[in-house]
Curated annotation (Swiss-Prot):
It comes from the Viruses. This is Ankyrin repeat protein C18/B24. InterPro entries: Ankyrin_rpt, Ankyrin_rpt-contain_sf. Keywords: ANK repeat. Signal peptide: none annotated. ANK repeats lie at residues 41-73.
Amino acid sequence: MYGLILSRFNNCGYHCYETILIDVFDILSKYMDDIDMIDNENKTLLYYAVDVNNIQFAKRLLEYGASVTTSRSIINTAIQKSSYQRENKTRIVDLLLSYHPTLETMIDAFNRDIRYLYPEPLFACIRYALILDDDFPSKVSMISPVIIRN
Protein backbone atom coordinates (compact mmCIF):
# COMPACT_ATOMS: atom_id res chain seq x y z
CA MET A 1 0.00 0.00 0.00
CA TYR A 2 2.95 2.31 0.68
CA GLY A 3 3.83 2.22 -3.02
CA LEU A 4 0.27 3.16 -3.96
CA ILE A 5 0.24 6.09 -1.58
CA LEU A 6 3.64 7.28 -2.80
CA SER A 7 3.37 6.62 -6.52
CA ARG A 8 2.00 9.17 -8.92
CA PHE A 9 0.05 8.55 -12.04
CA ASN A 10 2.01 9.59 -15.14
CA ASN A 11 -0.41 11.89 -16.93
CA CYS A 12 -1.61 14.17 -14.16
CA GLY A 13 -0.28 16.32 -11.36
CA TYR A 14 -0.35 15.74 -7.64
CA HIS A 15 -3.91 17.00 -7.11
CA CYS A 16 -5.26 14.63 -9.77
CA TYR A 17 -3.30 11.77 -8.19
CA GLU A 18 -4.82 12.46 -4.77
CA THR A 19 -8.32 12.49 -6.23
CA ILE A 20 -7.77 9.17 -8.03
CA LEU A 21 -6.30 7.56 -4.90
CA ILE A 22 -9.26 8.68 -2.80
CA ASP A 23 -11.75 7.49 -5.44
CA VAL A 24 -10.09 4.06 -5.58
CA PHE A 25 -10.06 3.89 -1.79
CA ASP A 26 -13.76 4.80 -1.61
CA ILE A 27 -14.53 1.78 -3.79
CA LEU A 28 -12.17 -0.63 -2.02
CA SER A 29 -13.19 0.44 1.49
CA LYS A 30 -16.53 -1.33 1.03
CA TYR A 31 -14.64 -4.62 0.96
CA MET A 32 -12.35 -3.93 3.91
CA ASP A 33 -13.13 -5.67 7.18
CA ASP A 34 -10.89 -3.42 9.25
CA ILE A 35 -9.70 0.05 8.25
CA ASP A 36 -7.00 -0.19 10.94
CA MET A 37 -5.47 -3.40 9.62
CA ILE A 38 -1.76 -3.64 10.29
CA ASP A 39 0.82 -4.82 7.77
CA ASN A 40 3.89 -6.96 8.49
CA GLU A 41 5.74 -3.83 9.71
CA ASN A 42 2.98 -3.03 12.26
CA LYS A 43 1.88 0.04 10.31
CA THR A 44 -1.60 1.10 9.25
CA LEU A 45 -2.87 2.89 6.15
CA LEU A 46 -3.18 6.04 8.25
CA TYR A 47 0.47 5.76 9.26
CA TYR A 48 1.53 5.60 5.60
CA ALA A 49 -0.71 8.53 4.65
CA VAL A 50 0.85 10.61 7.44
CA ASP A 51 4.34 9.40 6.55
CA VAL A 52 4.05 10.80 3.02
CA ASN A 53 2.12 13.87 4.28
CA ASN A 54 -0.95 13.01 2.19
CA ILE A 55 -3.40 15.13 4.16
CA GLN A 56 -6.46 14.46 1.99
CA PHE A 57 -6.02 10.69 2.15
CA ALA A 58 -5.37 10.83 5.90
CA LYS A 59 -8.55 12.86 6.32
CA ARG A 60 -10.55 10.33 4.29
CA LEU A 61 -9.17 7.44 6.36
CA LEU A 62 -10.17 9.24 9.55
CA GLU A 63 -13.64 9.92 8.15
CA TYR A 64 -14.01 6.18 7.51
CA GLY A 65 -13.09 5.45 11.12
CA ALA A 66 -9.32 4.95 11.15
CA SER A 67 -7.95 5.32 14.66
CA VAL A 68 -5.11 7.66 15.56
CA THR A 69 -4.24 5.33 18.44
CA THR A 70 -3.87 2.04 16.53
CA SER A 71 -0.28 2.69 15.56
CA ARG A 72 1.53 4.41 18.40
CA SER A 73 3.98 6.19 16.12
CA ILE A 74 1.40 8.05 13.99
CA ILE A 75 1.49 11.25 16.07
CA ASN A 76 5.29 11.20 16.29
CA THR A 77 5.56 10.69 12.53
CA ALA A 78 3.15 13.58 11.97
CA ILE A 79 5.25 15.82 14.21
CA GLN A 80 8.40 14.91 12.30
CA LYS A 81 6.84 15.32 8.85
CA SER A 82 5.22 18.62 9.84
CA SER A 83 8.59 19.97 10.85
CA TYR A 84 9.84 19.66 7.28
CA GLN A 85 6.96 21.64 5.76
CA ARG A 86 7.51 25.28 4.85
CA GLU A 87 3.85 26.22 5.13
CA ASN A 88 1.06 24.94 7.34
CA LYS A 89 3.46 23.15 9.65
CA THR A 90 0.73 21.94 11.97
CA ARG A 91 -1.89 20.97 9.38
CA ILE A 92 -1.46 17.18 9.58
CA VAL A 93 -0.91 17.32 13.35
CA ASP A 94 -4.06 19.41 13.82
CA LEU A 95 -6.01 16.95 11.68
CA LEU A 96 -4.91 14.00 13.82
CA LEU A 97 -5.53 15.87 17.07
CA SER A 98 -9.07 16.69 15.94
CA TYR A 99 -9.79 12.94 16.12
CA HIS A 100 -8.89 12.84 19.83
CA PRO A 101 -5.89 10.57 20.41
CA THR A 102 -5.53 9.26 23.95
CA LEU A 103 -3.15 10.73 26.50
CA GLU A 104 -1.13 7.49 26.30
CA THR A 105 -0.69 8.04 22.55
CA MET A 106 0.52 11.59 23.18
CA ILE A 107 2.97 10.43 25.85
CA ASP A 108 4.28 7.76 23.48
CA ALA A 109 4.76 10.38 20.75
CA PHE A 110 7.01 12.37 23.06
CA ASN A 111 8.97 9.32 24.18
CA ARG A 112 10.50 9.14 20.71
CA ASP A 113 13.27 11.29 19.27
CA ILE A 114 11.95 14.85 18.91
CA ARG A 115 15.12 16.88 19.55
CA TYR A 116 15.62 18.42 16.12
CA LEU A 117 12.09 19.40 15.27
CA TYR A 118 10.49 22.79 14.78
CA PRO A 119 8.37 23.97 17.71
CA GLU A 120 5.00 24.58 16.02
CA PRO A 121 3.82 20.95 15.74
CA LEU A 122 5.25 20.19 19.17
CA PHE A 123 3.34 23.07 20.76
CA ALA A 124 0.10 21.87 19.17
CA CYS A 125 0.60 18.42 20.70
CA ILE A 126 1.58 19.83 24.09
CA ARG A 127 -1.55 21.99 24.18
CA TYR A 128 -3.68 18.97 23.32
CA ALA A 129 -2.00 16.76 25.94
CA LEU A 130 -2.56 19.43 28.59
CA ILE A 131 -6.26 19.51 27.75
CA LEU A 132 -6.42 15.73 28.29
CA ASP A 133 -4.60 15.88 31.64
CA ASP A 134 -7.23 16.03 34.40
CA ASP A 135 -4.70 17.28 36.97
CA PHE A 136 -3.45 20.15 34.82
CA PRO A 137 -5.47 22.94 36.52
CA SER A 138 -3.90 22.05 39.88
CA LYS A 139 -0.47 22.07 38.26
CA VAL A 140 -1.09 25.57 36.90
CA SER A 141 -1.89 26.86 40.38
CA MET A 142 1.41 25.39 41.59
CA ILE A 143 3.40 26.92 38.72
CA SER A 144 1.81 30.39 38.69
CA PRO A 145 3.31 31.70 41.99
CA VAL A 146 6.78 30.68 40.82
CA ILE A 147 6.35 32.58 37.55
CA ILE A 148 4.99 35.67 39.34
CA ARG A 149 7.96 35.77 41.76
CA ASN A 150 10.49 35.69 38.93
